[in-house]
Amino acid sequence: MVNVGCFLPTYSASGPIEPASVLDMARDAEELGLDHVWVGDHYLWNVGMLSPLPALAAVAAVTRRVRLGTGVYLLNLRHPALTAKDVATVDVLSGGRLVLGAGIGGDNPEEYRALGVDPGRRARRFEETAAAVRGLLAGSGEPYQGRIVDLPAFTMEPLPVQQPVPLWLGGRASAVVERAARGAEGWFPVWVSAGRFQAATDTVGTIRGDLSGFAFALNLFTTIADTREAARDAVSNHLATAYGLPFDSFERYSAYGTADDIREYLAPYVEAGMTDVVFNIAGPDPRGQLRRLAAEVVPALR
């Protein structure tokens, strides 16, 4: 069985962000039986975006069951102690439902420069920040001294409900897969082929020896429509606005068309070991598309 989630519209490629739509779609996802809901994270982007953990705190107040995820949280752009505090807060408010999807975010170095962070040391910074955050969330009370991150000994309160808060690492590089296998609970890429997914499954299996409890999750831009042509127009316009790149760069990694088209697209990922898929719904009427996906695509994944 594949767990299914969706991204919430905390950014908009077609006008102002509508706060009510974020909460309404979260309610929809829970009522439709989805397993988790997700929000993205960017400081500087082609369109505005809400900050992820405050947004999930609001979502926690209007849901009771679905997991709440960041997809993915840019750890390097924040102080680890403040990140740990916010993560613990959302986990407590939600009753232990948070999944911390985290990534380096190196595709946009302008975000680093705007916040005074050196993008040239992003891999080392990420490893140290993640380790420091996890130590604080576990209540270790130990100091953390790395090459970049240096924290004194202290114990944060309150601690999160979950021990540990699941950490899923975003990113396509082999180094990310290996890092996830050694120190996280999941891998959560975007824009990867089914073949790449299979290779990652093999790598994690070799390193861990046991895949049980490890999530192989796919962030998948998805558009469902009555025809493949209509869906292609919608997803290509959405991605061109949000990412400023031609659709040719994304097409092979996007699921679009009728329900049959999307089910066919997903099949090789399921075969490769995908445990979770998160529909990143592109195009108009995301709530309507979510209802169609839940009715026409999700049953084939259960």
What name fits each language-model region?
Residues 1-302:
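Active-site-adjacent structural elements that line small-molecule/cofactor binding pockets in enzymes
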